[in-house]
Amino acid sequence: MLTALAPPALPGIPRQLPTAPARRQDSSGSSGSYYTAPGSPEPPDVGPDAKGPANWPWVAPGRGAGAQPRLSVSAQNSRQRHGPGSGFPRGPGSGPRPPQPQLRTLPSGEMEVIFGVGPLFGCSGADDREAQQQFTEPAFISPLPPGPASPAAVPRQSQVPDGGSRWATYLELRPRGPSPAAPAQFECVEVALEEGAAPARPRTVPKRQIELRPRPQSPPRAAGAPRPRLLLRTGSLDESLGPLQAAAGFVQTALARKLSPEAPAPSSATFGSTGRSEPETRETARSTHVVLEKAKSRPLRVRDNSAPAKAPRPWPSLRERAIRRDKPAPGTEPLGPVSSSIFLQSEEKIQEARKTRFPREAPDRTVQRARSPPFECRIPSEVPSRAVRPRSPSPPRQTPNGAVRGPRCPSPQNLSPWDRTTRRVSSPLFPEASSEWENQNPAVEETVSRRSPSPPILSQWNQCVAGERSPSLEAPSLWEIPHSAVADAVEPRSSPSPPAFFPWEAPDRPIGTWGPSPQETWDPMGPGSSIAFTQEAQNGLTQEELAPPTPSAPGTPEPTEMQSPSTREISDLAFGGSQQSPEVAAPEPPGSHPVGTLDADKCPEVLGPGEAASGRPRMAIPRPRDVRKLVKTTYAPGFPAGAQGSGLPAPPADPCGEEGGESKTQEPPALGPPAPAHYTSVFIKDFLPVVPHPYEPPEPSFDTVARDASQPNGVLRRRAENSTAKPFKRTEIRLPGALALGRRPEVTSRVRARGPGGENRDVEAQRLVPDGDGRTSPLGGARSSSQRSPVGPAGVRSPRPGSPQMQASPSPGIAPKPKTPPTAPEPAAAVQAPLPREPLALAGRTAPAQPRAASAPPTDRSPQSPSQGARRQPGAAPLGKVLVDPESGRYYFVEAPRQPRLRVLFDPESGQYVEVLLPPSSPGPPHRVYTPLALGLGLYPPAYGPIPSLSLPPSPGPQALGSPQLPWVSEAGPLDGTYYLPVSGTPNPAPPLLLCAPPSSSGPTQPGKGSLFPL
């Protein structure tokens, strides 16, 4: 630091300074340059500059003669080579120079020159001033050598070789130097404008006396300290936001509720023991069972996973997840609307995750208390704990997390997916379940990685998985996957396992019963839509318990069960996980909706072809779809949503179940639905807020999705992919549900082949029962779609919107439970209906109309119509489905199929595929559009009023207002579905109402649905 030590000037010397220069110094001229007045005592030759740098050697020499220190802005602004006759009376003759300016290098590196600052630096006279300056400055300067350390800002002076000096004024001069006592520090700055002309003539700028008020130590200290404070604040905000978001009310409430039961920190210890660094941190927070901890853990998880993706730690927990879902790169997430869904799901999943933890703890306490730490440990030492620990002793627990994992290294696999660290470990542990899990792990691992990249998935999956990643969410997700792989191994245990599943599943659900007893909980859960999902997911359990003979299905259910908790927890993740139990479970969380497809892809691939063998290869396949879906993510939310809420979730489940569900088709769908149930409630609601009711009513979509699940083997997967492109693609996937039905016979056959009809039927029946309860049957997902559609509109549909609540909360779950009895019958009807649908779907598959969602929902409804028709008839609107045209992104409300021939037509104008019902009974031009009035306004929801412009002669088979749904089914034959009136979002008949020749009944419904909702 250049500190100019001014040779102490004699006190008297300053008085020798000419007054004029002093006056000049005193002059208030701001920066105007003026030539020294002729009368100026100092002649042009006189002055420090006249003598050249030698006059001021002490000022600059420190830096080095001719060295020009960096000038502050002020100095640069006022640079001048001071002419020989600079305004400063610096000449030796003029008296001892004003106390030599101190050259000080500011921390910034700028050189500042401090002129003598007199305590009472008045403008009175140069003599007094100079004297004061010198008196003060000797002290001020001498300390300033240390002064450089002092923050006091110093005007900087740099000397150029020619002797010109640049003076910078550092306005903030801290008196904390040696002269803190100075009442006021005045800095005399000579501002010389650089002038190339006649440097000989002294152009001096009046020196301005600047009263330097010591900045309250702001420049160095204030700037330094407050800024870190800001950072700290930011961190605090992040922390607070993270906990707030994660715990936000819902989580806090859930945690608070569960913390009391969970007060015993088996999970805590277990999580602590959890050897996962990432999950461990999360789980440790989680294990603390503190709402904030849980919230933090969740935000931490989000941060851990999404921090790479986004800086804001708080946001990654919720908003970032939502954003990631919206723009999920790797198969993240669903849809922008999912953001709210994410919040709901996050809460739900957090609750579920906590419930899962709690279930683990509570169920462990209740069922497998001893297992609780193991369960928790299972998560940390999932591999050893599950593999080594004979989950058999603690099958329920073991099954939920690693029920079969114990015997099956799947626990590592489980870990591997849900614990990236463990997952990596899982790769070593891989060996046992690794065959499956290798594939699944890679996929899951990759998916998990995706999930990490895509907080949205993390939001879903991590909310569930991260939320439960420590306990069972991820583990369930993965152990769902392993469960699929382990399903066979788990099957036996599944029977024992169900209680644990139910307990933790029940806990998974915010169901009071979860705490009491696994089965008790599981029962309420079974009733609950979520429970139904769990039950259906656990329907495997249910089937395992109920249909233990059909271990294959139970095995499937068990993954489903395991997934079911995971589903609840991960809802979407579990959905994917349960669907693709092994592979998709993990991948799905990244792209839950992709999981729907992935489920279809992976589940069938992993599950269908052979949990391990098929899982591997297909995992590779599903993963592309996963990626696609992840990329398309818009569709996936639909699946999870569908699976969870109603038709939609089930279809993903079915796709997984039917595709992978040859063995576990039906059950994973059950799981799928449970998980999607949350999503559906949230996703579909948020996702399809405009048409949630139309969408939800199209429970057949659920079946369709399930069928799509079936179709995923062939068509459906494509559709899933396509559907993935758009949020409502789901619906279109549902349309392929007709194909799914076609597949469904296959899948059903496969499932039934797997479970000799009895098992399958058990699965189906139980699934359907859970479906009735939660409308979450895997097969029931599709079949139950009918049930769901009927019940769904009444109970499931409401729950479906509240599906997260249903699944998350026992009452919603219980609410569906009452419907379980009807659903139980429904299951048969639904199963039967789905079977007809399957043929219909096959027919529809043959029919071009099949390709799009419209056909699937109609197909679903057609078979469902008998049972659903009755149920749906109460609200004709529910018959319709909201379909999204992936090309145009338009939403079409499509009437439930009256079973006219469904044709999927491509509207080049809108670029949409429109499913048009061509009623076989209507010989008239298939494109006739019938006025909705034919059916009457009563059939349409207010949003779907008849479009007068669309009024056309009713078709020969106009369905009465009362029976438009069923009449269509009867009249239309298997796949003739509702007519699509792609009205381009407007009731105008002008939009190419593609082939709107619906029966008059369909016409009105179509107008209802026909009034396309371009969202």
Curated annotation (Swiss-Prot):
It comes from Homo sapiens. Residues 1-111, 139-164, 196-236, 259-460, 488-678, 690-883, 991-1015 are annotated as: Disordered. Residues 220-233, 380-391, 826-835, 847-858, 993-1004 have a biased composition (Low complexity). Residues 267-276, 531-542, 861-870 have a biased composition (Polar residues). Residues 84-94 have a biased composition (Gly residues). GO terms for cellular component: nucleoplasm. Pfam families: DUF4585. InterPro entries: CEFIP, DUF4585. The lineage of its organism: Eukaryota, Metazoa, Chordata, Craniata, Vertebrata. Residues 548-557, 691-700, 813-825 have a biased composition (Pro residues). This is Proline-rich basic protein 1. Residues 277-304, 318-328, 346-367, 759-774 have a biased composition (Basic and acidic residues).
